[in-house]
Amino acid sequence: MEEHSVGPLVPAVVKPEPSKNFSTDTTAAGTFLLVPTMSDLDKDFLCPICMQIIKDAFLTACGHSFCYMCIITHLRNKSDCPCCGHYLTNSNLFPNFLLDKLLKKTSDRQISKTASPVEHFRQAVQKGCEVTMKELDTLLLLLTEKKRKMEQEEAERNMQILLDFLHCLRKQKVDELKEVQTDLQFIKEDIGAVEKHRMDLYRARDRYSVKLRMLDDSGGRKSRHSSMDLNSSGLASSPLNLRGGLSSGSHTKKNDGKSQISSHGHGIQRRDPITGSDSQYINQSGLALVRKKRVHTQFNDLQECYLQKRRQAADKPHGQQERDTNFISREGYSCGLDDFQSVLTTFTRYSRLRVIAEIRHGDIFHSANIVSSIEFDRDDDLFATAGVSRRIKVFDFSAVVNEPTDAHCPVVEMTTRSKLSCLSWNKYAKNQIASSDYEGIVTVWTMTTRKSLMEYEEHEKRAWSVDFSRTDPSMLVSGSDDCKVKVWCTNQEASVLNIDMKANICCVKYNPGSGNYIAVGSADHHIHYYDLRNISRPVHVFTGHKKAVSYVKFLSNDELASASTDSTLRLWDVKQNLPVRTFRGHANEKNFVGLTVRSEYIACGSETNEVFVYHKEISKPLTWHRFGTLDMEDAEDEAGSYFISAVCWKSDRPTILTANSQGTIKVLVLAA
C-alpha cells in the first residue's frame, strides 16, 4: 500500500542569543575563553575586518591598523584599504609594535580581573617573583595538605558511589529473588493442583471401566439364562407343536447367537475408548509428543504468559481474591492457572493449516486478479469477494467446500464502475452488503435485486474502508484518502457525521459492543479511538506502529487488533487505553495483506504469499500456510510477485477464507 501522509514538521530549535557583554572564543586546546567585546574596550582596539581584538597589528600607509592575517587575506583579493579605499599593497604594510604592546597589556589586565588566585600565583612565579625558602616550605605544606584533603574527599566520594551502586544492585537482586520465590510458590501450588486433578481423572476413568465391566458381565449372564429358559420350554412342548417349537427354538438360537455376537462386539466397542487399542494409543501418544514439542518451541512466550496471568491474579483487589478463593476451593485451580490452561489448550490444539477447498483465479477472474476483500455474511452461509475486477461475487460456502471442483460459479454477481477496496455485510439485514471503491463512492447493495440501494459520493478521493455497525444496522462508517471519516445512515442521502483527520484514512471499524465508538487507522502511524457523541477529539490515540496502520479489528468490546506496514500486528486494550502485545513473523511493508480475528486467534497475510495465524497471548506465529502455484514459470517469481490480499475467519469454526494477489481463493482449516 502506498503512504501519502505528510509527516508533522519538526519544530525548529531556537538558539539562545549570545551575551551582549562577552563573546566566546575557542582555543586550540578546545577550551572556551571569555573575550571582551565593544562594551569593554575602545573600538580602536578592534580589527575592522574580523571585529575582534587585533592580533599581530600591522599599520597601513593610510594610517589604519589590522590583524596581519586579516589584511594579507584581504590584499589577495583586492588592492585597497578596507577602511578608506586607498590603494594598498603588501609593500605598504608595517608592523605596529606599540599597538601590540598596548593590546597585550590590556588583554593581561582583562585576564587578571577574571583569573583565579592560583592563576595569579602561577603568573607571579613565571614572571620571577622572589620567594624565600621558608615561604616555599609553608606553601608546599599548604599544598600538600590541600592535596591530601582532596584525595581523601575523592576517595570518600568514590566509596559512596560504589556503596550506593552495591545497595541498588542488592535491592534489585532481592526483588528479583522475591519474584522468583513467589513464582516458584505459584508453580509449586499449581503442580499440586494439576497432580490432584489428574489423579481424580484417573480414578474416575478406573471407576467407569469397572462399571462397564460389571455391566458387560451382568449382560452376559442374563443372555445365558434367557437362552436356557427358552430351550427348556421348547423341549417340554406337545408333539403337535413340536415342529413349531423346533423351528421357534432354532430361530431363537439364531437370534441369541446374533445377540451374543452383537453384545460381544458392542462390549469391545465400548471398552476400546476406555482401554484404547494399540493404534489409538500410538496416535494419542504421537499427538502428545507433537503438543509437547510445540510447547518447548514456544516455551519462553508460554512462560511469560503463565507468569503474567498468575501475577495478575495475585495482584487483584481483596474482594476479587475472595471470589477467586471460592473458585479455587470449588475447582482446585487458581484463576490464573485456569486462564493459562485455556491458553495452552487453544495454542497446542492446532499445528497447521489444511486446505479444504480452492477456487482458481483463471476460472472466475479475468485480467485483473487481486482480491481486495473477502467477507462472510451474517450466518456464515455466503461469502463475498471484491477487488480490482470491478465485480462483487457472492459464493455459497457449503457448495465451495463440498463440490469437488476448482471452478465455482457465484450465486450472485454485481458489476461496479470502479475497482473495489472493501466489503462489509449488514449483520441484521442478511441481503445487504456495503462496498467502498477507488473513486471514493460508498455503495449499499441488496442481494435480492442485485442493485445498489444507496450511493454516497461525498468522499473526494479513494475510499479504503467501510464497516456496518453491529448494534445499529442502519449505520455505517467509511474512511478515505481525503483524510475524512464519514458516518452514514441508510435512511438518508447525506453523511451524518464528518471527522477531518489531517491524514489519509486506511481503515475504520465499529466497536462490536457499541455503535458510539469507532477505531480509525491512518497513515500517521496511529490509531484514533473516537466516541461519535463527541468528535472534537479522540477518546485516545494509540501510538506504537512505525508506519501506516492498514487494518483495525475488534476481538471483543475491549480488545482491538491492528496491522501496519511495519510488518507487525499489535493488540490494544481500549478500556484501559494500553498496549498489550506486539506480534511479529509475517512480512508487510507496502500492501494491504488482510487482517481477521476470531476469539483467541488472529490471522493476517504476508507479502511472502503466506497466511499467518497468531494466538492472541503469544507474540510468535502459531502456524502458517504458503500459497502454491501450479504454473512452473510462475513458481520462480512467486515469492516476490504475489502476496496475500484478504483473509476472513468463519465465526463458528476455525476455518479461514484467504485470497491472494493472483486471485486464488483458498478455504483453510486449523488442524492438529
From Swiss-Prot:
Keyword Coiled coil: yes
Chain segments carrying region Disordered: 216-279
GO biological process: proteasome-mediated ubiquitin-dependent protein catabolic process; protein ubiquitination; red, far-red light phototransduction
Name of one Pfam family that matches: zf-C3HC4_2
Amino acid composition bias (Polar residues), ranges on this chain: 228-240
ZnF RING-type: positions: 47-85
Disulfide linkage: none
Alphabetized GO MF terms: ubiquitin protein ligase activity; zinc ion binding
Chain coiled-coil ranges: 129-196
Pathway the protein acts in: Protein modification; protein ubiquitination
Family: Belongs to the COP1 family.
Protein name as catalogued: E3 ubiquitin-protein ligase COP1
Source organism: Pisum sativum (Garden pea)
